[in-house]
A protein has these predicted regions:
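Acidic, glycine-rich low-complexity/disordered segments
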Residues: 1-74, 90-92
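Gram-negative/organellar outer-membrane beta-barrel architecture
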Residues: 48-179
Length: 179
């Protein structure tokens, strides 16, 4: 007689629960609608772990937050609240540069970038560069070549609260010579 072993598994899923409220805490700079528009889970939905994780991922991908902790809190037998505890991070950037080249002379510039401008999820970028070089000609005259440029860019990722990105930029460049 051969040995045998029968194994029976009894799998029982828990009761389905509905999402009662979505609560967002910890956002002092970012407007709540900027976060809510990334959600895949909504009040009244049957709770889905997959949708909760997708919402977490999409909020994280904004890159405005240092930490995001989603919490599920039971409220009664068949409802839950979903709480997103958010820690914002500084998202503005500044850059400065200086350099010298025998061909182009001295150059310098700087700029600022605000990826969450005024907490609305918009992008504002401003930069300025200036260059100065000396050249000597055979007639012993010295001339200076000056160049400067200015750029400003703005993007709105949700035009009229729809996921349509619109943006524009203005670029100005000036080159000249003095004797």
């Amino acid at each position: 007689k051969e040995d045998s072993l029968d194994v029976n598994f009894l799998i029982s899923e828990g009761e389905l629960v509905k999402v009662r409220k979505i609560i967002i805490e910890g956002n002092s700079k970012t407007y709540e609608n900027v976060i809510r528009r990334e959600l895949m889970i909504f009040p009244g939905d049957t709770f889905s772990r997959k949708k909760l994780l997708e919402s977490y991922r999409d909020i994280f991908m904004l890159n405005f937050f240092r930490d995001i902790t989603p919490n599920v809190v039971p409220v009664g037998n068949d409802e839950i609240d979903v709480i997103f505890d958010i820690e914002e991070k500084e998202s503005g950037q500044a850059n400065f540069s200086m350099g010298y080249s025998g061909v182009t002379g001295f150059q310098g510039g700087g700029g600022f970038q605000f990826p969450n401008f005024l907490g609305k999820g918009q992008l504002l970028s401003i930069s300025y560069n200036r260059g100065l070089s000396n050249s000597y000609q055979f007639s012993a005259n010295q001339s200076e070549s000056i160049s400067q440029s200015f750029n400003i860019e703005f993007q709105e990722p949700w035009l009229f609260d729809t996921p349509n990105l619109v943006g524009g930029s203005f670029y100005y460049q000036e080159k000249g010579q003095t004797n």
